[in-house]
Amino acid sequence: MLDWHKGGGRAPGPGSFGVRFFMMLNWNELEAQCLSCQKCALADKRTNVVFGVGPRDAEVMFIGEGPGENEDLQGEPFVGRGGKLLDDMLELIDLDRTKIYIANMVKCRPPKNRDPLETEQYACSEWLSRQIALLDPKLIVCLGRISAMKFIKPDFKITREHAELPGKTGRRMETKQR
């Protein structure tokens, strides 16, 4: 399971079901459990749980921060303005959206599209951890600061490190025009 800081809210420990329970679920069971989740306050105002979308054998997984208004209404990640930008970027690198799996750090929309709180991320951590375990992607692409802080490093600064490829390869990829 991912390393999450414990906080207040409705998810006092590793979750109401326990880590072992989550790690035994298949895709359909995981999604069914997630759709009825009440582990944090975001559940109170959501229209839909935004579980994730894409082939469940994809080699590439994109992880965003959380659903926006359009995503909450449609129950699918990256269908609003962010989805249009993602589609444009995927087209530029000749990557077919139907070949990737897309999920978010949290499965319900934070109010006013604010960043997900640490407690909300923690409440959703079991869902995301199991999605990653089931998918077993070759590559995880972080979309935004919140996911980069969890998967790359806690003090990740997107304005400073957005063009860096983490790891020991020593490679750099330019992501903006100079």
Task: Give the location of each predicted region.
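Residue-identity detector for glycine
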Residues: G7-G9, G13-G18
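A polyanion-binding, active-site-adjacent surface
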Residues: F22-R178
